[in-house]
Every structure is written in C-alpha cells, then in structure tokens.
Curated annotation (Swiss-Prot):
Key words, A-Z: DNA recombination, DNA-binding, Metal-binding, Plasmid, Transposable element, Transposition, Zinc
Binding positions for Zn(2+) per the UniProt entry: 213, 216, 234, 237
Listed Pfam families: Cas12f1-like_TNB
Annotated InterPro entries: Cas12f1-like_TNB
GO-annotated molecular function: DNA binding; metal ion binding
Organism of provenance: Aquifex aeolicus (strain VF5)
One GO-annotated biological process of the protein: DNA recombination
Protein name according to UniProt: TnpB-like protein aq_aa05
Family per record: Belongs to the transposase 35 family.
C-alpha cells in the first residue's frame, strides 16, 4: 500500500485525521480516503500593507493579478507588479474545450443527454479538468499572497460573483454555468488557503471595472486587433492597455476607496489624470511563482478623500 507524501506534509503542518475513513474504487485501483482537519483562527485585517486584486477570466487569461503596496500614512498606493496566470494551464483549458465540443457533437448526433453513454464518460473528464484548473489557479494566487505575507499583512480581493442570468442558446448558458462554477471554486479554495496561511480575503462589486478607463475615468471599449488578446481603448484620452489589466486597476481603485472611507460606500479616490506608465520589461521578480508569464506595469496612484 502506497502512502502519499502529501499526507505526511499535512500531518507535519498540524492537521489531524478524523477517526472515519472510506474506501474508494477508481478503475482497478482502490484508495483509502482520510479526512484531515486543523483548527485555525480567522485573521482580521483592517489596514493591509499589500492588496492583491484578482480579475478572473477563466478563458483567455485564467487570472490577471495586480499586487499593490499601500502606504497608509502617505495615503499612496504603488503597483508592485502584474501577473497573468496562463502558460501551461491554458493547455488544460484547450483540452477541456475540445472534450466539451465532442459532447456537443455526440448530443447532436444521438440526441442523448450528458448523463448517458459516452457523453457521461466525457462529461466526467470535463468536470475533472475544471476542478484541476480551478485548484491550480487558486494555488498560483495563494503562492503570491503567501510570499508577500512574509513582508506584511495581505488581502486578496476578488470581484463579487453575480447570479446567472438567462440567455438565449443552451451552449451559452452552459458556458456561463461552467465559468461561474470555476470562479466560485477558485474563490473558495483561496479562502481555505488564506485561513491556513494568514492572509485575508475580501470582495468588491464590479462597478464598470471593465468599461471605464483606469487613466481618466471615461468610458471605453474592448477590441482585439490581432484576434488573440483583448485590449481596452479609451474613447476620450486614447489610452490603450490590456483589458484585464485595466479591470484590475479599476477594481483596486474601488477597493481602496472602500478602505479609506472606513468600509463605507465605495467612491473614486484616484485623481483624474493620474499617469500610468507604459509597460516595462524591468521590474521586481515574483520569485516562487511557477509556470506563469509575468508582465510588469508601474503606477503611483495619488489617493485623496476629496
């Protein structure tokens, strides 16, 4: 009988096994499932040194992560770096989408539901891939939070998930359900890791974060000149930036305004005309963050309560 190293790692970190266990059969193999538990105290963070804003895409870039360092005395926020979670993880997304398309083809040919025959087998693979992707994205986010927790208190901020709205077309509705499930799974896993690692988790309502220019505040639009990546173009100032990065900036501004107003109603606190420097290849090295492409931007956002 094989005993996985992961079990010893968890036991070494203070986890204790429950008395009950269960026997699991997968194919021709049998496994013993053991539930471990650990008592932790949730950490209340009111003035974090680092705010990590996360925009979950789960398609093009699985996640766009902005790491911001906050100086509460000077009321100044500085962007430490931007990281895209994609790379090898996107291969799992492509594999999942391929299987998903196979399910659709078989449904059109046979008229069978996903719970019958080959469709059921393929659907199990899709579910396993979704779970694997969600857990790995959550680990990427948590690795960054844990690294910066060594320097000061950290809060990871996600956009508040909205309820699913009905749309015409079964395929679109199903895609939305899958994406909603993945976002929720990622957030739940990051929360679990945060309780253990000591960093906080919070949410912000996505109030026009993807539609407004993070430089001047005017409304803009997305476009894809090469067909591979989405950019944001401001109709007023002409500012062009990666659309996910623009959303992360706006999300951060909203959350900082929430913190500076003592948890009150969020309102813009970044002065109109705040400069955003162009992307640079130079920057801090986010060590300990594997399998990802990192692009750095810099911003010094002057914060005021007006």
């Amino acid at each position: 009988m094989k005993v996985y190293k992961r079990l010893y790692e968890l036991l070494g970190r203070g986890y204790k096994p429950l008395k009950s266990a269960r026997l699991i059969k997968r194919g021709k193999d049998y496994y013993i499932g053991i539930t471990l538990q650990k008592a932790v105290k949730e950490k209340k963070i009111k003035k974090p040194r680092y705010v990590i804003n996360v925009d979950l895409n789960v398609q093009r870039n699985l996640a766009c992560i902005g790491i911001f360092e906050v100086d509460w005395e000077k009321r100044e926020s500085k962007l430490y770096g931007i990281k895209f979670v994609n790379g090898k993880l996107l291969r799992l997304v492509y594999k999942r989408d391929y299987l998903f398309e196979e399910i659709r083809k078989k449904q059109r040919q046979t008229g069978r539901s996903p719970q019958v025959g080959d469709n059921s087998r393929l659907w199990k693979k899709v579910n396993n891939l979704n779970r694997d992707i969600a857990l790995k994205v959550a680990k990427e986010i948590s690795d960054i939070a844990r690294e910066f927790s060594e320097k000061g208190e950290v809060i990871v901020v996600f956009e508040k998930l909205k309820g699913l709205r009905g749309r015409k077309g079964r395929s679109k509705k199903l895609n939305r359900k899958i994406n909603f499930w993945m976002r929720r799974k990622i957030q739940e896993r990051v929360k679990e890791l945060g309780l253990e690692e000591g960093f906080g988790l919070d949410f912000v309502y996505p109030h026009y974060t993807s539609k407004k220019c993070s430089k001047c505040g005017y409304e803009g639009e997305r476009f894809s000149p090469s067909g591979s990546k989405a950019l944001f173009l401001c109709k007023k100032c002409g500012y062009v930036v990666n659309a996910d990065v623009n959303a992360v900036f706006n999300q951060h501004f909203l959350y900082l305004s929430h913190l500076l107003n003592g948890g009150g109603k969020a309102r813009p606190v970044v002065r109109v005309g705040t400069s955003l420097k162009s992307p640079s290849r130079e920057g801090h090295n986010l060590s300990g963050v594997p399998k990802a492409t990192t692009t750095f931007f810099y911003i010094s956002s002057l914060l005021s309560t007006f």
